[in-house]
Swiss-Prot record:
It comes from the Viruses. It is a multi-pass membrane protein. GO terms for cellular component: host cell Golgi membrane; membrane; viral envelope; virion membrane. This is Membrane protein. Residues 40-49, 100-221 are intravirion. It holds the Pfam family CoV_M. Residues 1-18, 71-78 are virion surface. Its main location: virion. Belongs to the betacoronaviruses M protein family.
């Protein structure tokens, strides 16, 4: 190490040689999370990705706070304070939107840091909730050998005659209704159907299924 406390090029080279294997594993894990960690592909990797995203917020905020406390000069200190405020406001807005979505859907998927759009499908006496990346005008449902897939998510066994008449897509501000449109059976246990959006408003899910299965939303006063 040099007299002024910095490391030399040779020392940096030796450090990289010693940590190359660890760095390679870190980049491999990052690649796997970015390429394969999707909710409709690998649920285990997706949960790890969500935990990683949750941890990034407090770690990032702590870095900017420490940079402000142990500032190099007043310019970097001011930048660190500004960035800490921005990150804090972004983190707060995430919690506000998540709790609003949770109040609407009562699903823990509301705290997903990747998206605040949730698909809600009433099936077999309960509401199955899955995350969506965007809200579409038409949502397709495909049944292959008795297994239902909707918007890329596997929802379990279902016959085409048992498809719900209505599904919803919830955000922190709105709830969109989708009505079952055209459907077609293929063979004995396969088929496909399309749900068309026909209404959008400030609603919340009705989790009481003692009545009709079609009544799955209540107006938020």
């Amino acid at each position: 190490m040099a007299d002024n406390g910095t490391i030399t090029v040779e020392e940096l080279k030796q450090l990289l040689e010693q940590w190359n294997l660890v760095i390679g594993f870190i980049f491999l894990a990052w690649i796997m999370l970015l390429q394969f960690a999707y909710s409709n592909r690998n649920r285990f990797l997706y949960i790890i990705k969500l935990v990683f995203l949750w941890l990034l917020w407090p770690v990032t905020l702590a870095c900017f706070v420490l940079a402000a406390v142990y500032r190099i000069n007043w310019v970097t200190g001011g930048i660190a304070i500004a960035m800490a405020c921005i990150v804090g406001l972004m983190w707060l807005s995430y919690f506000v939107a998540s709790f609003r979505l949770f109040a609407r859907t009562r699903s823990m998927w509301s705290f997903n840091p990747e998206t605040n759009i949730l698909l809600n499908v009433p099936l077999r006496g309960t509401i199955l909730t899955r995350p969506l990346m965007e809200s579409e005008l038409v949502i397709g449902a495909v049944i292959i050998r008795g297994h239902l897939r909707m918007a890329g998510h596997s929802l379990g066994r279902c016959d085409i005659k048992d498809l719900p008449k209505e599904i919803t897509v919830a955000t922190s501000r709105t709830l969109s209704y989708y009505k079952l449109g055209a459907s077609q059976r293929v063979g004995t246990d396969s088929g496909f159907a399309a749900y068309n959006r026909y209404r959008i408003g400030n609603y919340k899910l009705n989790t009481d299924h003692s009545g009709s299965n079609d009544n799955i939303a209540l107006l938020v006063q």
